[in-house]
UniProtKB/Swiss-Prot annotation:
Keywords: ATP synthesis, Cell inner membrane, Cell membrane, CF(1), Hydrogen ion transport, Ion transport, Membrane, Transport. PANTHER family: ATP SYNTHASE DELTA CHAIN. It is found in: Cell inner membrane. It is a peripheral membrane protein. This is ATP synthase subunit delta. NCBIfam families: ATP_synt_delta, PRK05758.2-2. Belongs to the ATPase delta chain family. The keyword Transmembrane does not apply. Pfam families: OSCP. It comes from Neisseria gonorrhoeae (strain NCCP11945).
């Protein structure tokens, strides 16, 4: 959701900056991952949305559920709870993860395929994409049957659409203009 991304960005950047200062980038990534997963669970999501539960109770429950030990991460959860922003934790995690990859000179890539890919195919694609984008890529694969065939690759804001659906859309656009 674009709105969540906009709201989460300053929180992710601030937390990442603090993590750099404290030399805790990787360890906080793990804590954020757990927090993001917990707030998406049904009962916890309902609790977060309940106006009757005050912010400090929500923060304490999350901190206990995840088992956070780090003082700064606990304070971060308390700040988010006070601002009624706990629901953006998954987006904060995603952006923090992107900042971590960027810091380590790695880009995130998603390969969308109409059909499951073998490990060999993913490996070959990874080699080609690493060369094309002149960067080390962390690749994930998602199945999207609506592509009909072929693949679509997203690296940051760049999209390489080699799918049948993409070609049909381009053909349709050409024919209707």
């Amino acid at each position: 959701m674009a709105e969540f991304a906009t709201i989460a960005r300053p929180y992710a950047k601030a937390l990442f900056g603090l993590a750099q200062e404290k030399n805790q980038i990787e360890s906080w990534l793990g804590g954020l991952e757990k927090l993001a997963a917990v707030v998406q669970e049904g009962k916890v999501a309902l609790l977060i949305d309940r106006p009757e539960t005050n912010a400090s109770e929500k923060a304490d429950i999350l901190i206990d559920l995840v088992g956070l030990k780090d003082k700064e991460l606990k304070n971060f959860v308390i700040v988010l709870a006070g601002q009624k922003r706990l629901s953006i934790l998954p987006e904060v995690y995603a952006q923090y993860q992107d900042l971590t990859l960027s810091f380590n000179h790695i880009k995130s890539a998603v390969i969308y395929s109409a059909y499951p890919l073998t490990d060999k195919q993913v490996g070959e694609l990874a080699q080609m994409l690493n060369k094309r984008f002149d960067s080390e890529l962390k690749i994930s694969v998602e199945i999207e049957p609506e592509l009909i065939g072929g693949i679509k690759v997203e690296v940051g804001d760049q999209v390489l659409d080699l799918s049948v659906q993409g070609k049909l859309s381009a053909l349709y656009t050409t024919m209707t203009n």
